[in-house]
């Protein structure tokens, strides 16, 4: 079970975007995340008349390692850690470590 999933709101802990919040839009591999508006780089794209794309400079969100982000707890307004709790029926749910509140699925 992944502790950070697509649709979760996260806050960046390290790097040039430290303190910024964003929503996870994609999980790459097992430990990299693409977050909307975070870790933006400028890519130079060649024009391709076969595909109908024009060339130019495009801003693109690049992956960031999950160890550099933490899930955002809206109740406290701070970054929080994620724990796994086993329910009575055997199912597992994600909870905030600070409060024990269940994290709602996005």
Curated annotation (Swiss-Prot):
PANTHER family: MITOCHONDRIAL RIBOSOMAL PROTEIN L24
MF terms (GO), sorted A to Z: rRNA binding; structural constituent of ribosome
PROSITE patterns assigned: RIBOSOMAL_L24
GO cellular component, one term: ribosome
One Pfam family cited in the UniProt record for this chain: KOW
Gene3D superfamilies listed in its UniProt record: 2.30.30.30
Protein name as catalogued: Large ribosomal subunit protein uL24
Positions of transmembrane segments: none
SMART domains in alphabetical order: KOW
High-level lineage: Bacteria, Pseudomonadati, Pseudomonadota, Betaproteobacteria, Burkholderiales
Subunit structure: Part of the 50S ribosomal subunit.
Stated role: One of two assembly initiator proteins, it binds directly to the 5'-end of the 23S rRNA, where it nucleates assembly of the 50S subunit. One of the proteins that surrounds the polypeptide exit tunnel on the outside of the subunit.
Key word RNA-binding present: yes
Membership in a protein family: Belongs to the universal ribosomal protein uL24 family.
Claim: RNA-binding is one of the keywords in the record: yes
Gene Ontology terms: biological process: translation
Keywords: Ribonucleoprotein, Ribosomal protein, RNA-binding, rRNA-binding
């Amino acid at each position: 079970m992944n502790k950070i999933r697509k649709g979760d709101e996260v806050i960046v802990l390290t790097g040039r975007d430290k303190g910024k919040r964003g929503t996870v839009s994609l999980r790459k591999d097992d430990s990299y995340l693409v977050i909307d508006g975070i870790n933006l780089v400028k890519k130079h794209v060649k024009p391709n008349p076969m595909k109908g794309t024009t060339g130019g400079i495009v801003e693109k969100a690049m992956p960031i390692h999950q160890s550099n982000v933490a899930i955002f707890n809206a109740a406290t307004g701070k970054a929080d850690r994620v724990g796994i709790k086993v329910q009575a029926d055997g199912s597992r749910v994600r909870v905030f470590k600070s409060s024990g509140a269940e994290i709602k699925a996005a």
